[in-house]
């Protein structure tokens, strides 16, 4: 099994590349989906986030993602702290998901922050998907149903 890292910014076309390779039999793991699952299910990680950022989970232990985003995206040090907490969990869960597809000759690891997270170290090859800024903006507007002003 070969692991191919797939990276690029929002709207570059990573999803299109992944869909075409999956149609040819490649496996696929989406780092963003792994993170969302961890946010919903991993009590240890949620507890660490709640301790670090003070009250970002409710009484049922559900993560308040907008509250966490407001904290970390307004302070680069807090964003780094978030990444330091979550990266080991994302890495382990991603590798587990990749190895669960070991029957596939190729598994794509779709991670927008592949290099920043150090995930390139377990990839055999890397594909960086690029697109002009205007194209990316147009795709995001269409994909997310946004207005031009958004």
Each PLM stretch: what is its role?
Residues 4-6:
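Hydrophobic anchor at the beta1->P-loop junction of P-loop NTPases
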Residues 9, 21:
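P-loop (Walker A) phosphate-binding loop of NTP-binding proteins
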Residues 12:
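ATP-binding Walker
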Residues 15:
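Walker A/P-loop
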Residues 33-105, 150:
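ATP-dependent small-molecule kinase phosphotransfer cores
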Residues 94-101, 106-142:
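ATP-dependent NMP and nucleoside kinases share a basic, alpha-helical "lid"
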